[in-house]
Amino acid sequence: KLLPILKDKWEEDCIIITIDDDTIYENDLIKNLVNDYYEHKCVVGYRGFTPKFDKLEHFDYEKRDNLQNLSLYNFLTGKGGVLYKPEFFHKTKDLIFNDKIYSDTCDKQDDIWFYIVRILNDIKCYTTLKEWHTKDISAIGLYSVFNSKNNNNTLSFTKTIQKLKELHYM
């Protein structure tokens, strides 16, 4: 859902907010995301965590640290709504659109792709324990069906980092 609108708005100074269609959100979600963006000037979302690692290459989706509200390394899951700006990805030019990388390394984990490219662009992420939804109406999600098995998010993350190193993005 992010990539088509991001490509369309690439040269614009605008805010893009992604949400899921299987969730009923708090009435103030958009207002809160925008207000937090103006305060912190970075990616903002309300469902995420601070991973526990000493180097990016040692990322493990299942290892969590105490939440730091503002950090380069905060990981957001799109379910909680995420606020982006196209300029957050400009430093690495059109890397974000390189489907030869992400379709090969993290085709079921777009959150991982956006996370890594955001970090390569040196854009921090703000997250907090703010109410963001009233009801989840999904019967089953991608995480429970695929990504929770065998630590697939971590495996995809590692593959993506390796590929980016091979291509000299890191």
What label would you give each PLM region?
Residues 19-22:
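Active-site acidic Asp-centered loop
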Residues 11, 76, 107-109:
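A generic fold-level signal
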Residues 91, 95, 99-170:
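C-terminal catalytic/acceptor-binding lobe
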Residues 1-4, 32, 39, 159-170:
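Electropositive, surface-exposed helix/loop patches at the edges of structured domains
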Residues 3, 10-12, 37-40, 70, ...:
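Catalytic phosphate/metal-binding cores of nucleic-acid and nucleotide-processing enzymes, i.e., regions
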Residues 16:
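Short aromatic/hydrophobic "clamp" motif used to bind/position activated sugar donors
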Residues 5, 9, 24-99:
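Conserved catalytic core of nucleotide-sugar-dependent glycosyltransferases
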